[in-house]
Amino acid sequence: MDLWQLLLTLAVAGSGSAFSGSEATPTILGSASQSLQRVNPGLGTNSSEKPKFTKCRSPELETFSCHWTDGVRHGLKNAGSVQLFYIRRSTQEWTQEWKECPDYVSAGENSCYFNSSYTSIWIPYCIKLTSNGGTVDQKCFSVEEIVQPDPPIGLNWTLLNISLTGIHADIQVRWEPPPNADVQKGWIVLKYELQYKEVNESQWKMMDPVSATSVPVYSLRLDKEYEVRVRSRQRNSEKYGEFSEALYVTLPQMSPFACEEDFQFPWFLIIIFGIFGLTMILFLFIFSKQQRIKMLILPPVPVPKIKGIDPDLLKEGKLEEVNTILAIHDNYKPEFYNDDSWVEFIELDIDDLDEKTEGSDTDRLLSNDHEKSLNILGAKDDDSGRTSCYEPDILETDFNASDVCDGTSEVAQPQRLKGEVDLLCLDQKNQNNSPSTDTTPTTQQPSIILAKENKPRPLLISGTESTQQAAHTQLSNPSSLANIDFYAQVSDITLAGSVVLSPGQKNKAGISPCDMPPEVASLCQANFIMDNAYFCEADAKKCITVAPHVEAESRVEPSFNQEDIYITTESLTTTAGQSGTTERAVSSEMPVPDYTSIHIIQSPRGLVLNATALPLPDKEFLSSCGYVSTDQLNKIMP
């Protein structure tokens, strides 16, 4: 309905203007405008259809003015339709009377101006707009809060300097404070902000606010034209006033060449060459440290290495130097068996633990299983002329110590042996109820091969097949047990490390140790004095066969050391005359040689024993002895 009414009104207005002229035009347009406002309220100047405050401003902190919109009746309202009333608080209370605006004209249309008579700082104000007796808008403030100074005036610039290249220049911009602001007396303190740009640009470059009325601008191009403007604000406020008029700065071109394009530093080339140089340095570093880098990336596998040994010694084959180095450590002992002679020893088979419970050591020694050991003892020594497996220095020390020990115990030795014989005799009486029968075995005399050197060595018994068979027959025959002594007790340990064993059964001649007098039992145990003359070991042990006949010939007592292999010439000549009668009595029977002391423990299965000498006839004496001097031979031979 309203739209049709509006269209009808326009049509009537058009027809009326054709007839009555322009007199009725304002009235018709006013009614049409009201109709349009009712149809579409957004077409009005104020969408709220009410007057409203836009701003209140004090340019110098002495006066202020407020502005508002006129609302719906813009340009058509009657005078006095919109009014402004204000009130201010004096002391601590608001005045109850609202006062109307003192000046609607000085500040412009739709504004109210308050001069210095109506302005008070640090006192709050409240203002309101009324239309047809009703309040449409209201606002409260203080004068110092609405200060917005006027723009500065009198802008100009001064050239400071020009660069050596003639491309850039520095200028100084100056201006004057706003004329209505009492800056000289300090009533108001202002801050200024300068902005500049090239004429063809749209973005302004702002400088920091300053309190002075001049500021330098640096690095302006000489061939460009710049636009400069300034605005101000109160020191304690953030609201800037209006900008001043723009100042155009045109700098003359002082350079002889055109500077449309500045000299560009070749950053691109520098970056390329820099990367290339760094790459070359990196490659050189890797090439020079490739071994170290390889060890860091791929560490070598550690190999066993003995500290203190030079690998070159192992490559060159100097094993003696290696053994010397290793001998420094306590847990290493050099092995000399590679370069030593064969060592003869009796092998004891103790692999099977069950065999230990089958019988005694004596039964196993006499059994057929021990034939292997006898064969070893009966093997011929082709290496008899070689030196012993033990170092001469070590053996020389051991035998010297043994000689000292034997010399000091010369008096106590017979007494100790006598006591041991008594103990063995007592054990034999307890074990044997009936005396054993003595039978004289017939054996061939085994040959004794001696060492070439003057140092003692373990004895090797070698002979023909008949000798081996005779020895086996004698050991296997029960009747020959009377001629064998088994040493089961340790009587003494010498300083050289040898163990002296004591017999536990009858002697080889069939006479029990308890039936023999103490002098006979200790006849061959006396110590002899070692001499430098060489002679066979077998002749030194003839006192063993003389022992049964000592009752008749006790006046002759040869003195030699049982553990020594070589005897002196004096002892040999003393016993040479008696050997004939003694050997005739015992030539018919020859006992198996007995091992009275342990020389060394070769292995967990083997023992190296020192063998007692066997009596030999006169004819065998020279054949078995290869180391007799001429003087000794002249004394022995008739």
UniProtKB/Swiss-Prot annotation:
Chain positions covered by the region annotation Disordered: 428-448
GO cellular component: a single term: cytosol
Extracellular topological segments: 19-264
Chain segments annotated as transmembrane: 265-288
GO function term, MF aspect, one: peptide hormone binding
UniProt short sequence motif WSXWS motif, positions renumbered to this chain: 240-244
Residues spanned by motif Box 1 motif: 297-305
Annotated signal peptide: 1-18
Protein modification: The soluble form (GHBP) is produced by phorbol ester-promoted proteolytic cleavage at the cell surface (shedding) by ADAM17/TACE. Shedding is inhibited by growth hormone (GH) binding to the receptor probably due to a conformational change in GHR rendering the receptor inaccessible to ADAM17.
Keyword rRNA-binding attached: no
GO process terms (BP): cytokine-mediated signaling pathway; endocytosis; growth hormone receptor signaling pathway; positive regulation of cell population proliferation; positive regulation of receptor signaling pathway via JAK-STAT
Domain of life assignment: Eukaryota
Compositionally biased region (Low complexity): 430-447
Region (Required for JAK2 binding): 294-379
Disulphide bonds in the chain: C56-C66, C101-C112, C126-C140
Localization annotation: Cell membrane
Renumbered ranges of motif UbE motif: 340-349
Pfam families per record: EpoR_lig-bind, fn3, GHBP
Residue positions the entry lists as glycosylated: N46, N115, N156, N161, N200
Residues exposed to the Cytoplasmic side: 289-638
KW Transmembrane helix (keyword) present: yes
Quaternary structure (record): On growth hormone (GH) binding, forms homodimers and binds JAK2 via a box 1-containing domain.
Domain notes: The WSXWS motif appears to be necessary for proper protein folding and thereby efficient intracellular transport and cell-surface receptor binding.
Record's function text: Receptor for pituitary gland growth hormone (GH1) involved in regulating postnatal body growth. On ligand binding, couples to the JAK2/STAT5 pathway.
Assigned protein family: Belongs to the type I cytokine receptor family. Type 1 subfamily.
Descriptive protein name: Growth hormone receptor
Organism: Canis lupus familiaris (Dog)
